[in-house]
Regions:
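Acidic-leaning, charged glycine-interspersed low-complexity segments
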Residues: 97-147
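Short beta-strand/turn micro-motifs at beta-sheet edges
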Residues: 57-65, 126
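Conserved short hydrophobic interaction patches
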Residues: 12, 16, 91, 95-103
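"Short basic amphipathic alpha-helical interaction patches in structured regions
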Residues: 55-57, 87-95, 106-110
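Hydrophobic secondary-structure block in the mid-to-C-terminal portion of proteins
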Residues: 131-173
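Residue-level signal for secondary-structure boundary sites
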Residues: 49, 83, 145-149
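Small/polar-rich, solvent-exposed N-terminal microdomains that initiate assembly or binding
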Residues: 1-60, 155, 159-173
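Oligomerization/assembly interface segments of phage tail-like spikes and tubes
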Residues: 65-81, 90-92, 133-143
């Protein structure tokens, strides 16, 4: 997944959940655990759905290889005491169908496909026997992965010569 797609998803999820952008982080980043509410994101299972479609670009000899690609985005919501992270994620899942959000995703070249069932991961922490309200959901998305290449193909060939009977000829391809 490219950086622009990551940034778009990060910022959109923060907006849809009504959180500051600093409260949404990519999983496995170095640093300390932030104050709740906190959302972690992890993208995995990225897979091309078909062979790449090779299209010429505006630059001579350059081609863009475009592949429709699916991936899963795990969203974990760590809530405050007395909150219900399952409800927050349920709201997040429903919002991907809003016309304004659909416009945003289309402009970013991303499509929301579906969400797996939300899991309530609330559990006891440490010896204090305090509950940590937490829930997770896997969101499935599609985007077009693009790789640009200049394979060095010969686009044009000109051959000039003479035949035994002195006939001039030119071949262009």
């Amino acid at each position: 997944m490219v950086s622009e797609t990551r940034k778009f998803l990060h910022d959109t999820i923060a907006d849809l959940l009504g959180l500051e952008k600093k409260s949404v982080i990519w999983n496995r980043q170095n640093g300390f655990k932030q104050a709740t509410p906190l959302v972690t994101l992890m993208a995995y299972s990225e897979q091309g759905e078909s062979m790449a479609n090779m299209l010429p670009t505006e630059n001579e000899g350059e081609y863009a290889l475009k592949t429709p690609t699916q991936f899963v985005l795990e969203v974990q919501y760590f809530g405050n005491k007395g909150t219900f992270p399952v409800d927050e994620l349920s709201s997040l899942v429903r919002q991907w169908d809003r016309p304004t959000v659909l416009d945003l995703t289309q402009n970013a070249g991303v499509a929301f496909l579906y969400a797996d069932p939300i899991q309530d991961l609330t559990g006891l922490l440490g010896n204090d026997q305090q509950y940590e309200p937490r829930a997770a959901v896997d969101l499935h998305f599609r985007y077009t992965a693009v790789v640009v290449d200049n394979p060095g193909y010969i686009d044009t060939v000109e051959i000039h010569g003479e035949t035994p009977k002195n006939m001039d000829w030119t071949v262009e391809s």
